[in-house]
Amino acid sequence: MLFRSGYVGYGVLDKKMKYGGEVEYTLNPSRSAKISYAYQNTLKEVGSSMNFNLFEEYGKNFVATRFEYIIENKLEGDFHISRPLKLDVSLSTKDVTPAYTYSYKGSPLLNYRSDDVKLSLRYAVGEKHTMIGIYRTVTFAGNPVFTFDYTRGLGFRENSFTYNKIEASADFVAYNRLFGQTNVRIEGGYVDRSLPYGLLFSGEGSKGGNFSFILENTFQTMHPDEFLSDKYANLFFKQNFGAFLFKAKYFQPEFSVAYNIGIGGLRNASDHEIDFNVKKHPYQESGLIIDNIIRIPILNLVYLRLGIGGFLRHGHYEYDKFEDNLSLKTSLKILFK
């Protein structure tokens, strides 16, 4: 089965068109085996690490301050080796133009190329599927879920780079009748040599201006491009106690506490002439979230759930003024009935 998609957009601030498209062919529906070719000419946040879902990607771009223009050609194939194990292999060529002023190893870096092969594995314990027509649909996402990404920079074109990059994550969910739901995510990454800014790890923070959303698995009090790393390890913890105080049709507040911590490192930091910090010491923050303050049904299909959260930066990287360490955010979730 052949599937086609595409998009066209226009940037009001940079006055440039963004566009892309994808052609996908399903080889074996029962194993979700497919191959695809995608092209895009777009703008993306510099140094993003593990994959986010669509809403989180939009949220990250909303608060990000450093971007790159990317022209990419990508050939990709993926399938389920077994019910819980999925394999994805891709070959990508990118022409990258930083939309920020930056010098690398003493020379201005106006553009570069990034050509790579990437292998991704996802293992979801207990994941369940069903076939709806010719489509394989996930009915239970699995718990815990492990991911592993290996990227090999090929460096076969001029002004491109050879490197090895690894990222891995583990997500755990536990339920308790008295204490509610516990979510834990552990993630880390490593690059084996000095590379330009956009090929390293940054963008772990999601603190915006006066208005921003809570984005899961990011640091809510950290500015998007505050730190730069070629190695990192993060832990995100959230305890949701549920709606134990009030329950009404449009008002079912759920109380949660959160604690996030991360550490990183960067070799040859002097190679990069741009403002950043290195996360040599643990970065810590804690938060209180009230989800589902407003619960709005839409078309009898989903609930739009609005809430609020407050997070406090503390430890080695806290600021002198209390208000600078505080981040107030809006919680937005969509839940199917």
For each predicted feature, which ranges?
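Exposed, low-structure sequence patches enriched in small/polar residues
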Residues: M1-K337
